[in-house]
Amino acid sequence: MIGLQTALVMLLFLVAVASGLVFFRYAQDIAAARAAVSEGAQIAPTAVGPLEYGETGSGTPLLSIHGAGGGYDQGLAIAADLVGGGFRIIAPSRFGYLGTAVPADPTPDAQADAHAALLDALQVDKAIVVGISAGARSAIALARRHSQRVSALILI
C-alpha cells in the first residue's frame, strides 16, 4: 500500500500535468482565434486616426456596431445573420477592441464621430446603422450627431 504522502505527490503531479495540458490547449485556441480575426481586418486611415473594420457584401451600406466582447468580427457575423444579400456590411471595431486604439476621449460621442469618419474614408454618404448591445450607445450618438448620415437606426 502506498503512503499518504506518496499519494498526495502523485495527485499533485497529475493535477500539474492536467493543468499544463489545459493551458497548452487554451494557448492554441487563443492563437487560432487571433489569426482568424486578423485575416479579415482592414485599417482605414481616417480624420480621427486609424480605425479597424471588416466589410462584406455589396448593395445598401449597413454599419454594424458590435457590443461588448467582440470586434468587427462580431458586427459582421450578427449583421450577416440578420440580413440577406443586397447589403454592404461595414463593421468597425469600437475604441479599445481588436485593432482600434483607445483615444484620449473614448465617449460615445467621440465614437460616433469616428464612425462618421470611417464612412467618410469609405466614401459612404449614408448607411443603415445597427447598434448591437453596448454598440447601441455610439449608434444613437451617430444618429443624433450625424443624422444626415443615418438612413435608419436599428438597436439590438
Task: Mark where each language-model region is.
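An N-terminal hydrophobic leader/cap segment in hydrolases
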Residues: 4-43
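Short, well-ordered coil/turn elements that cap or connect secondary structure elements
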Residues: 38, 84-86, 124, 147-148
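A short loop-to-beta-strand scaffold at the N-terminal edge of the catalytic core in hydrolase folds
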Residues: 46-56
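Conserved HGGG/HGGXW glycine-rich cap/lid loop of the alpha/beta-hydrolase fold
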Residues: 54-99
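Hydrophobic/aromatic ligand-binding patch that stacks against planar heteroaromatic rings
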Residues: 81, 118, 141-142
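Short, solvent-exposed loop/turn segments at secondary-structure boundaries
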Residues: 101-106
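Conserved acidic catalytic loop of the alpha/beta-hydrolase fold
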Residues: 110-128
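Conserved hydrolase catalytic core segment
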Residues: 126-156
